[in-house]
Amino acid sequence: MFTGCGTALVTPFRHDLSLDEPALRRLIRRQIDAGVDFLVPCGTTGENPTLTRAEHLRVVQITVEESSGQVPVLAGAGGYNTAEVIELAKDLESLGADGILSVTPYYNKPTQEGLYQHYKAIAAAISIPIIVYSVQSRTGVNVEPATLKRLAQIENIAGVKEASGNIGQIATIVSQVPEQFSVLSGDDAIALPVIALGGHGVISVVANEIPAEMASLIQACLEGNFACARELQKTYLPLMEINFIESNPGPVKTAMAEMGLLEPVWRLPLVPPKIENLEKIRGILESIGLVGKVHAAATN
């Protein structure tokens, strides 16, 4: 179910910091129209930590409504309190989410056995698929290949979003888990080599800006057309990289605001990029022709 190009959706806010529901609906429709394979609301890129529980549920509800079964919805549900994650996961299942993306517990830094028991408990509480989200740079915890091999034996643990950036580790994971266990790149810039190693797709930040192009890149990879994929990668790699010039989702929301897709609003402790980085973002957008393209489409 969760293969190909999944978009880690941003969460748009109004200037009064409230959730901008009309903008969110427009962004979701834009993704579906562009041909992405699944949607991922309320992850890191969706500023999940600064959403209230009610807002979290509302964002997922809107995503389910707007997707209308056209693409699966993989909703964020992670944390360092297993019991609370279970309750959130149950609520998301009730709302119609097709699966959950669950980041590893952070701050309390569980052992590998603790990680296994954490995900096993979540899996026992819900019937929809779980994608493990391993991002050591943010959580301080790495899900080791041996742990993922164990987790893959649990029926509804369906895959991993692997954001270690460690190609050797990803190769080991692919070699040890069943073929149907989705190994998804958590980094746009290395999605191509991850799929070449046997991975199944990406959970993408850059697809917020270029959904059709990123969907095409991933589809080319999955079809083995790496010459085409490399050309797309060459064109859009600067955008993939500039999205992380500061903490995500600061740069991507800045770019989307420049493209006329949303208001440039974050919730503290996130702040707008520095002026010099804003100019770099604008330069990349102009170099690949995105600003005028989207503004023109928005006015037609």
Regions found by a protein language model. Give the residues of each.
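Catalytic alpha/beta core domains of metabolic enzymes, predominantly
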Residues: 124-125, 138-244
